[in-house]
UniProtKB/Swiss-Prot annotation:
It comes from Pseudomonas putida (strain ATCC 47054 / DSM 6125 / CFBP 8728 / NCIMB 11950 / KT2440). Belongs to the phosphatidylserine decarboxylase family. PSD-B subfamily. Prokaryotic type I sub-subfamily. Is synthesized initially as an inactive proenzyme. Formation of the active enzyme involves a self-maturation process in which the active site pyruvoyl group is generated from an internal serine residue via an autocatalytic post-translational modification. Two non-identical subunits are generated from the proenzyme in this reaction, and the pyruvate is formed at the N-terminus of the alpha chain, which is derived from the carboxyl end of the proenzyme. Keywords: Cell membrane, Decarboxylase, Lipid biosynthesis, Lipid metabolism, Lyase, Membrane, Phospholipid biosynthesis, Phospholipid metabolism, Pyruvate, Zymogen. The modification Pyruvic acid (Ser) is found at residue 252. The gene is psd. This is Phosphatidylserine decarboxylase proenzyme.
């Protein structure tokens, strides 16, 4: 009954208004408030501050600075296995596996269209048909910067407007097409394993999504917008494996897509597996 009421509330709540209000609170610089709120959050979610570059909670100018905190050098060593594809973020594997008939598995009885996830462009989605996906959920206690699974050159970024349903196991099991309905930022790279998409999916009270090349991407105007980076007039944007790609201000999900016969997921990983940025997520499927 409780989960049913929760799902009903997800359709009724003003997602974007609540998220913008959360963003205002998270950017509040009133010292007593931001210190008290940050301390409460760190205790409530058992955030490990010993690995943070700045351990003193009161040193952060606002809650968002704490939430997107940098880590100490070496806190997330990169797997050195030749050809390793790295996990882009701390969190847990929500699902991973093949993209079958253009669909990505969400939870029992639910899936969503890879084409819709990527913004609806058939040409962008075509290289991923029959490929592989991995969905990584970032919990409140996690490190909230997203990094490159492989070295790549940015080809395209797409902002896709949408709802802001909460992202958790309950919504994954009850909200159809969840990740293809929420607001998201699609980043398309050319890599040694062919095209790679990294999709940063928003959620309720996710105040904004940033990338290292564009800065703040959300919240923009409520329309789909495509940014091309492969034009001759632009300086190429190349990011090395393990380099920061972007960050969430208040959390959610990163989805990585590869084309067919390019990667093989680590056998130790499955739905629910805890992961850390920099560990091996997959290996090349072929030499």
């Amino acid at each position: 009954m409780k989960s049913r009421l929760f799902i009903i509330s997800q359709y009724l709540l003003p997602h974007h208004l609540l998220s913008r209000l959360a963003g205002c609170i998270a950017e509040c610089r009133v010292r007593w408030f931001k210190n008290a709120f940050t301390a409460w959050f760190a205790k409530r979610y058992q955030v490990n501050m010993s690995e943070a570059l700045v351990e003193d909670l009161s040193a952060y100018e606002h809650f968002n600075a704490f939430f997107t905190r940098a880590l100490k050098p070496g806190a997330r060593p990169l797997d050195e296995t030749p050809g390793a594809i790295l996990c882009p973020a701390d969190g847990a594997v929500s699902q991973l596996g093949p993209i079958e008939h253009g669909r990505i598995f969400q939870a029992k009885g639910h899936g969503f269209s890879a084409q819709e996830l990527l913004g609806g462009d058939p040409a962008m989605a075509a290289p991923f048909m029959g490929g592989e996906f991995a969905t990584i959920y970032l919990s409140p206690k996690d490190y909230h910067r997203v990094h490159m699974p492989l070295a790549g050159t940015l080809r395209e970024m797409v902002y896709v407007p949408g709802r802001l349903f909460s992202v958790n196991q309950t919504t994954a099991e009850n909200v159809p097409e969840l990740f293809a309905r929420n607001e998201r930022v699609v980043c398309l790279f050319d890599t040694e394993r062919g095209p790679m998409a990294v999709v940063l999916v928003g959620a309720m009270i996710v105040a904004s999504i940033e990338t290292v090349w564009a800065g703040l991407v959300t919240p923009p105007k409520r329309e789909l917008k495509t940014f091309r980076y492969d034009e001759a007039s632009r300086t190429p944007i190349h990011l090395e494996k393990g380099a920061e790609l972007g960050r969430f201000k208040l959390g959610s999900t990163a989805i990585v897509l590869f084309g067919p016969e390019q990667v093989k997921w680590a056998e130790s990983l499955g739905a629910g597996s805890a992961v850390r940025m920099g560990q091996q997520l997959a290996a090349p499927a072929q030499a």
